[in-house]
């Protein structure tokens, strides 16, 4: 997956593990991902969550005839982070013919849960 000139590149998101069972992505907490008060921006967490779900879903579709696009995402931000790296772990909870649903947990460097997200992806024909 080419991440050049994408939101992923702009936010420093990297996919570090990607299988049908789970996708792990990491993102720095730095000047690109914080809000004006210096805390990790909730929108950056949501971008990380959707990235992990979308990347993971690539293992579950037929690339010759199908593509996955975001349909819905929500997030509960549980703790704040001011520095370091955050890690998203996305696991599928529903793999259907037309939708795939992931739950995503985001952790800080101390392995504290900072965000819980659910992302629904539509499986569409190319």
Curated annotation (Swiss-Prot):
UniProt keywords, alphabetically? Hydrolase
Q: What is its EC number?
A: 3.1.2.-
| Keyword Transcription tagged | no
Q: Which GO terms describe its molecular function?
A: 1,4-dihydroxy-2-naphthoyl-CoA thioesterase activity
A Pfam family matched in the record? 4HBT
Mention any one GO cellular component term assigned to this protein in its UniProt record: cytosol
Role of this protein:
Is not required for competence.
**Stated family:** Belongs to the thioesterase PaaI family.
Q: What is this protein called?
A: Putative esterase ComA2
**Natural source organism:** Bacillus subtilis (strain 168)
